[in-house]
Amino acid sequence: MVKVGIVGGTGYTGVELLRLLAQHPQAEVVVITSRSEAGLPVADMYPNLRGHYDGLAFSVPDVKTLGACDVVFFATPHGVAHALAGELLAAGTKVIDLSADFRLQDPVEWAKWYGQPHGAPELLQDAVYGLPEVNREQIRNARLIAVPGCYPTATQLGFLPLLEAGIADNTRLIADCKSGVSGAGRGLNIGSLYSEANESFKAYAVKGHRHLPEITQGLRRAARGDIGLTFVPHLVPMIRGIHSTLYATVTDRSVDLQALFEKRYADEPFVDVMPAGSHPETRSVRGANVCRIAVHRPQDGDLVVVLSVIDNLVKGASGQAVQNMNILFGLDERAGLSHAGMMP
C-alpha cells in the first residue's frame, strides 16, 4: 500500500485527489494539510467523502510527518512546493506537484510569467514533466514530477501526432481553448461568481497566458525545433471541462490523419481517438481521466482541425497526478482511474 500525503487539501484539485484516491486499491491517504483548516475532519468539509476519510483531519504541514509518506502531492498555489520539495526529496519521499512550480525548465522564464524568482532552481534538473503519453519511461524513475496544466494537456495531446510526424507547418499553430470556471480555482474571484460567469462567454489573457510557455516548451520537443503558437483561452459557463479547437496547416493531402492519430495513441489507456467525423463533448469526459480527440480536414483542404476535450480537474490535474503515481510505483496505470464520464 502506497502511503500518500497531500499538501493543500482544500482546493478543487485537492478534493479531486481525495475523491480519486478513495477508490484506489493500492493507495492510502495518511496526511492532508491545510494551515487554515487544521484540526477539521476532512469529511466535515467534504460531505461527499463521508465514509471514506472519517478518521482523517487536516493538519499543519510538517516535513517530518510528510517525509514518512511514500509520495506527497502538492495541490497548492505556485511557490509553495519550492519551499518544501527539497526537504521531502532529501528524506526519500517522492514528490508529485500539481502546481506550475517545476513545469518550466528555464527558471528565468518561470519568473517572467509568475512574477517572482524561482524558489528552487537547483531541483529543475530532477523534475520530470508528467505527461505520460510522452515521458512514461522517465516518470518510472523520477523523484520529482511536474504534473502538466489543463490547457497544456489538452493542447499537446491534440497537436503531438502532427508535430512528431513532421507534417505540419510548425510556424502557424493555433489553439482556441475553452475552460469551465473550476479552472480558476476555489478562491474568491469576481470573474468566477455565478452572476458574472453564467450566461456569458469571454476570452481572456489574449496577450499571454501563463500556460503558453509550458505548451510551447512541449511542442518544441515534439517538433524538434521552434514553433509558432497563438493560444487564446476562453471562460465558458460550465463547472468542469476543457475544449481545445486546434488548427494546423498540413499541405500533404495524402496523409491519412485518422490512421496517424489512431496509431499514435493505440497503446494509451487514457487517450480516446474517436471515429472520423466525430465531435467530442466535454460532458463525455466529466469525472474521467480521459482525453477524447477527433481530427478533421474541412473541405479536404490544407487546414487540419483537431478537437481535444478533457476534464480540467481529472486528466487536466488530479487524475493525471494519480496516473503518474501509478507509473512511478509500478502499479497498474489504470488503478483508481477507471471511472467513466458522467452523463448527463
UniProtKB/Swiss-Prot annotation:
InterPro entries cross-referenced by the UniProt entry: AGPR_AS, AGPR_type-1, NAD(P)-bd_dom_sf, NAGSA_dehydrogenase, Semialdehyde_DH_NAD-bd
EC number(s) on file: 1.2.1.38
GO molecular-function term, one example from the UniProt record: NADP+ binding
Annotated active site: C150
Substrates-to-products reaction catalysed: N-acetyl-L-glutamate 5-semialdehyde + phosphate + NADP(+) = N-acetyl-L-glutamyl 5-phosphate + NADPH + H(+)
Organism superkingdom: Bacteria
Pathway the protein acts in: Amino-acid biosynthesis; L-arginine biosynthesis; N(2)-acetyl-L-ornithine from L-glutamate: step 3/4
SMART domains, A to Z: Semialdhyde_dh (SM00859)
One Pfam family, short name: Semialdhyde_dh
Cellular component, GO annotation: cytoplasm
GO terms under biological process: L-arginine biosynthetic process
Annotated compartments: Cytoplasm
Leading EC class: oxidoreductase
Alphabetically ordered keywords of this record: Amino-acid biosynthesis, Arginine biosynthesis, Cytoplasm, NADP, Oxidoreductase
Similarity section: Belongs to the NAGSA dehydrogenase family. Type 1 subfamily.
Role of this protein: Catalyzes the NADPH-dependent reduction of N-acetyl-5-glutamyl phosphate to yield N-acetyl-L-glutamate 5-semialdehyde.
The protein's name: N-acetyl-gamma-glutamyl-phosphate reductase
Organism: Pseudomonas syringae pv. tomato (strain ATCC BAA-871 / DC3000)
Primary gene name: argC
